[in-house]
């Protein structure tokens, strides 16, 4: 079993145990989640209130019980995640992938930054020199970035990986 973080619980919603959910909308497709420190909980109800998602979990029946979960991390089992359409990726699947420029490995994805308008790959370089091992930021949606099976390929960008 492999768990991946999909969000956190925000403030309680109303009086019957609802919790605001801050995170990936993939939660809309799940029947259960793993709650940090509390184990697996079935999702009994899930709905939108404006732009927010509200989750009701099994065993969380009032506001007091919901308050105990505020701020906790929420996880899903990778096998429970729905498949994505072509060209879309779960972030966790990109972390650790090698990055190549013209067939030469220049680094590895160590994190992904949500920069608002687009997501940015944080790539830690590989090489002998300290400069080679520096972290570089590359927009994931840029036309010069291609995600392929098991690797990421970046067209040459003058000065970035020289």
UniProtKB/Swiss-Prot annotation:
Binds ribosomal protein uS19. GO terms for biological process: ribosomal small subunit biogenesis; rRNA processing. Its main location: cytoplasm. It holds the Pfam family PRC. Keywords: Chaperone, Cytoplasm, Ribosome biogenesis, rRNA processing. Belongs to the RimM family. It is found in: Cytoplasm. SUPFAM superfamilies: PRC-barrel domain, Translation proteins. Residues 86-160 form the PRC barrel domain. The gene is rimM. Signal peptide: none annotated. One of its GO terms (molecular function) is ribosome binding. This is Ribosome maturation factor RimM. An accessory protein needed during the final step in the assembly of 30S ribosomal subunit, possibly for assembly of the head region. Essential for efficient processing of 16S rRNA. May be needed both before and after RbfA during the maturation of 16S rRNA. It has affinity for free ribosomal 30S subunits but not for 70S ribosomes. The isolated N-terminus (residues 1-80) forms a closed, 6-stranded beta barrel; it probably has the same form in full-length protein. The PRC barrel domain binds ribosomal protein uS19. GO terms for cellular component: cytoplasm; ribosome.
